[in-house]
A protein has these predicted regions:
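Long, hydrophobic, well-ordered secondary-structure blocks that form the structural core
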Residues: 118-119
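Short helix/turn-capping signatures at newly exposed starts of structured segments
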Residues: 1-113, 123-126, 132-150
Length: 150
């Protein structure tokens, strides 16, 4: 099931790069609101859709409570079959093409069972789109999480 189209991947990433990083976990709610994300009972999770059964954004933090990365499932193979895996693969290709159009060639591009593509962005952050047979994941790495790609 495609949860979010490629343009959402691009729009959210471009908006995230505009934020004044570093941002503390407790200071993130107004920024989440700018993305249209709503708070949940957990301080490191935000709801992206009105449907509470759909994925939430999960924030990763470092010891200083600064956000270092964000994770969001963009598509899921709910049928767990080959057709669903093929649909995920097609969605991965669409998202990589959208990323190439927005930011140029990825510095990381891996094919195979667990494909991935990643881009260095202007503010020292990174966007990564990765997948497999069961889900596709958007990962935005803030400048505070740079070491994840060192």
């Amino acid at each position: 099931m495609i949860i979010f189209p490629p343009q959402d991947f691009i729009t959210w990433t471009n908006t995230l790069t505009q934020f004044p990083w570093p941002i503390q976990l407790n200071d993130f709610p107004p920024y989440a609101e700018k993305l249209g994300w709503k708070p949940t009972p957990l301080p490191d999770e935000f709801s992206v859709c009105d449907d509470s059964d759909v994925e939430d954004v999960i924030l990763g933090v470092i010891r200083s409570e600064e956000i270092c990365d964000l994770f969001l499932v963009m598509a899921r193979n709910e049928t767990e079959d080959f057709e669903g895996a093929a649909e995920l693969n097609d969605h991965f290709v669409s998202c990589v093409a959208a990323g190439q159009k927005a930011w140029g060639e990825p510095f990381l591009l891996e094919a195979g069972e667990d494909p991935a593509a990643a881009w260095r962005l202007l503010n020292g952050s990174f966007a990564q789109f990765s997948g497999g047979g069961d889900a596709l994941l958007l990962r935005f790495v803030t400048p505070q999480g740079w070491w994840r790609f060192a």
